[in-house]
Every structure is written in structure tokens, then in C-alpha cells.
């Protein structure tokens, strides 16, 4: 991976996104760009035009992307007092739609508009924040219908995109990442005793360490924060 090219973090103002951007700088990436609702240009996941404009801005910088990290996601909606479902009786259509808009549709549009900007000659990496509960094979406890389903759909997008990406550049890598339980606004209501809880900085360091050491055979994989692969 050529660290002199551009590293992009979408969702770079969130707890994990900001920590990822800082870690990339510490790892020697020369140009790290963060994009989100408060960036210039603005990138809003539910607005495809803004995603396209943000991609055009990156293209105008004149260098390819060596690493693209989608650090976006929603688990609960504080504004509307909506939390992950404990039972199918709590399924709410608007909350279900919102989970898919942020966790699935947004990343799909990032893939659409940013993949053409990935380095086509040297190794490039695209990583998207998923969640272990999005694994169908690992679902042992049920619940969290909207979040699980939207992250499972994201994982299918990542797996499918990894196949097409490798056809254009054998060195390109596309993976899903589970950051672990992190002290962030997203996961704060769900932290409990017995869980390994990391700071955003710890999680970012662990994930970047994985990404900079990926091999071509890792393309299309789902990684836990500790480097172990998670079944789809």
C-alpha cells in the first residue's frame, strides 16, 4: 500500500472515525481526509448527491485512494427514543428503514462513487465498520432485528464488492470490520460487565494494524478487532 496516496475516512467526526484518522496519520499516511456531515464538502449518507460530490472532491486532489474506511453506522435513535428490538413485537418500520438507510444503503453508495478512485495498480484497501451481530452464522441470542439485518445486508454487499474489485485489481482488498465494544455514543447504552471494552483509540489502532498487514487472500473477509476472522 502506497501511504503517499490518499486515505479517506467516511464518518471521520464520530468517536471511532476520528480515532481512525488520527491513527492513520501516526502510521505515516501522508494525506488523510475525513468526510461526514460537518466536513467540507459535506457527505450525508442519505443524500447520494452529497456522496457523489465528496467523491469528486477526492478525485480533484489528483491522487488515488490507498485506503478507504467507512466508519459510519447507527444502532439506536436517541432523538426518537428507539432502541434495538428485544422481540419481534417491537419491530418498527421507520426504525427498520433508518437502520438500512445508514448501515446498508449509505455504504452501498460509498462503494458506487468511491471505488473508481481506489488505486488500480498498487494495493488498495476498503474497510467498512460492520458488527459481529451481523453474522448469520454467529447469531446465538436473537433480538436486535433491525441492526442485525442491516449489518448482515452490509456484509453481503462487502463480500459481493470484493469479488468485482479483485477482477479489476488483484491487489485490491475489501473487508468488513467489527470494532469490538467501544466507549462511544453508539455503544454506551449497551456496555456491561464482562465485555472487553476499548477506547476509540485502542480499537482504531487494532483495526489499522490489521488493515496494513492484509494480504490478497484476505479479500472478502470479515475481521474481528483482534485479527480473528468472523464467519459470515
Language model features by range: what are they?
Residues 10-25:
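N-terminal Rossmann NAD(P)H-binding glycine-rich loop of SDR-like oxidoreductase domains
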Amino acid at each position: 500500500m502506497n501511504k503517499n496516496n490518499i486515505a479517506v475516512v467516511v464518518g471521520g467526526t464520530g468517536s471511532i472515525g476520528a480515532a481512525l484518522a488520527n491513527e492513520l496519520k501516526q502510521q505515516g499516511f501522508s494525506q488523510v481526509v475525513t468526510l461526514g456531515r460537518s466536513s467540507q464538502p459535506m457527505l450525508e449518507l442519505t443524500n447520494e448527491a452529497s456522496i457523489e460530490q465528496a467523491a469528486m472532491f477526492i478525485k480533484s486532489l489528483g491522487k488515488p485512494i490507498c485506503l478507504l474506511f467507512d466508519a459510519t453506522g447507527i444502532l439506536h435513535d436517541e432523538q426518537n427514543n428507539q432502541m434495538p428490538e428485544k422481540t419481534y413485537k417491537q419491530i418498527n418500520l421507520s426504525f427498520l428503514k433508518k437502520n438500512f438507510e445508514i448501515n446498508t444503503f449509505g455504504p452501498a453508495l460509498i462503494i458506487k462513487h468511491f471505488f473508481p478512485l481506489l488505486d488500480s495498480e498498487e494495493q488498495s484497501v476498503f474497510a467498512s465498520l460492520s458488527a459481529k451481530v451481523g453474522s448469520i452464522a454467529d447469531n446465538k441470542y436473537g433480538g436486535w432485528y433491525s441492526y442485525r439485518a442491516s449489518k448482515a445486508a452490509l456484509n453481503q454487499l462487502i463480500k459481493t464488492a470484493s469479488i468485482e474489485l479483485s477482477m479489476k485489481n488483484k491487489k485490491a482488498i475489501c473487508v468488513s470490520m467489527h470494532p469490538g465494544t467501544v466507549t462511544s455514543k453508539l455503544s454506551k447504552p449497551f456496555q456491561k460487565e464482562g465485555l472487553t471494552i476499548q477506547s476509540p483509540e485502542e480499537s482504531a489502532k487494532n483495526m489499522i494494524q490489521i488493515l496494513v498487514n492484509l494480504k490478497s487472500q484476505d479479500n472478502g473477509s470479515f475481521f474481528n478487532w483482534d485479527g480473528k476472522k468472523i464467519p459470515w
